[in-house]
Amino acid sequence: MKNINPTQTSAWQALQNHFDAMKEVTLAELFAKDADRFGKFSATFNDQMLVDYSKNRITEETLSKLLDLAKETDLAGAIKSMFSGEKINRTEDRAVLHVALRNRSNTPILVDGKDVMPEVNAVLEKMKKFSEAIISGEWKGYTGKPITDVVNIGIGGSDLGPFMVTEALRPYKNHLNMHFVSNVDGTHIAEVLKKVNPESTLFLVASKTFTTQETMTNAHSARDWFLKTAGDEKHVAKHFAALSTNAKAVGEFGIDTANMFEFWDWVGGRYSLWSAIGLSIILSVGYDNFVELLSGAHEMDKHFSTTPFEKNLPVLLALIGIWYNNFFGAETEAILPYDQYMHRFAAYFQQGNMESNGKYVDRNGNAVDYQTGPIIWGEPGTNGQHAFYQLIHQGTKLVPCDFIAPAITHNPLSDHHQKLLSNFFAQTEALAFGKSRDVVEQEFRDQGKDPAQLENVVPFKVFEGNRPTNSILLREITPFSLGALIALYEHKIFTQGAILNIFTFDQWGVELGKQLANRILPELGDNKEIASHDSSTNGLINRYKAWRG
């Protein structure tokens, strides 16, 4: 994987010049010039997904220059490096192989000369057997009752991915009730424990090291709660399993290491739902549906690693994102799923993107002088329309948006889905083409009103348009199509990081706060006044101590 400053390439300079010619061009003009624009700037994946990127402020020349940037920064080499098991996470000396976790072809993938696939398959088989015992009721709790509730205790990648997927795939869920606890705020675990019975609850403790502060604090609280009823510590083994690699700590906790599911240092947390961290997904929707999820992602992996860039969906979406981020100065991207089951999708890729590409140091260790990762946010439609779309339509900030929707709903109630999709289609049209002053005035005339008398209102009803969007239409949200969609975004993020010359797979930015919290925690153990920090931190700690009593 080469270290190339993108701004020093001839392609970047060409894009800068091209931007000067494009910045005033409107989407209305682009569509008026080309009746086949949709045909040229859209593509279908596996007859399951349509990606329409025609409502972007791009031309064929724009894409050509962006593709030149991908070539000049050796994106092809970066993709090959990742898929071949090279240690592209150099700051932690690790390979990056979430693609191996869903490698349904089972072709060998080597790390340090060793094929990782036998171990991947062994853990999958172990999860299959365990999940089947739980789901079937064969596995019994300490009083002989089958498991009814599963509580996943994890944080970050050990929580966001499994929670997002189990919510997205709720139509496929079985009888088990799923709960997720992440926050070290005791309220989170306390509220979940109110809902479950210790005799029929299984806790999954998801921590690679089995030392993560938030996760282990919650796990010990769950264990204490359980033992208040169960009494004997030997019963812990019937009600707790671990997603970890620290067999010693797992055993000391009281978990049978036969119920410890391993993953490897080449699995990054925010790319780990495909690993043992996905056990909660299997328990929710069954092993076969989990395999379908893996299969959908694997198909997207094949597309990403083998398709020429000009037809490569993750690459195209990544390049369009760079176009807005680095040339138009757009600071954010909104992810807007028109499906209530997908309500955690934006939050998941908020971590996926911002923890991956929120870096100001390049792969050479130098501070960058260009923009890297964007701010990611979003909510499901149509809720967002009644909240923040006002700013997207008429605000002063450029917010490129991804609209996502299924053609087929899992809940065909009355005409709900047609109304939902009519909004989906209308919003991208409105954002692209807006409403001119002439149209506003004509609407007033059609209502029998005199535009001249309404001069003070007309400007506020004008929509400039020219707001860019991608539309991703899925045939239906299934385990397969969801797997493909997640992998699409994963590879988009990797592509942008590769081109922008940053390390996408470390996350040193989360460390400093943790270090300082560990330093401050002992200071909160008494009521002595603190003077060891800056005046603000001292003031906050001392007021906290005064108020807590």
Curated annotation (Swiss-Prot):
It is an enzyme of class 5 (isomerase). GO terms for biological process: gluconeogenesis; glucose 6-phosphate metabolic process; glycolytic process. GO terms for molecular function: carbohydrate derivative binding; glucose-6-phosphate isomerase activity; monosaccharide binding. GO terms for cellular component: cytosol. The keyword Signal does not apply. The keyword Cytoplasm applies. It is found in: Cytoplasm. Its EC number is 5.3.1.9. Keywords: Cytoplasm, Gluconeogenesis, Glycolysis, Isomerase. InterPro entries: G6P_Isomerase (IPR001672), G6P_Isomerase_C (IPR023096), Phosphoglucose_isomerase_CS (IPR018189), SIS_dom_sf (IPR046348), SIS_PGI_1 (IPR035476), SIS_PGI_2 (IPR035482). Pathway: Carbohydrate biosynthesis; gluconeogenesis; Carbohydrate degradation; glycolysis; D-glyceraldehyde 3-phosphate and glycerone phosphate from D-glucose: step 2/4. It catalyses: alpha-D-glucose 6-phosphate = beta-D-fructose 6-phosphate. Belongs to the GPI family. Catalyzes the reversible isomerization of glucose-6-phosphate to fructose-6-phosphate. This is Glucose-6-phosphate isomerase. It comes from Cronobacter sakazakii (strain ATCC BAA-894).
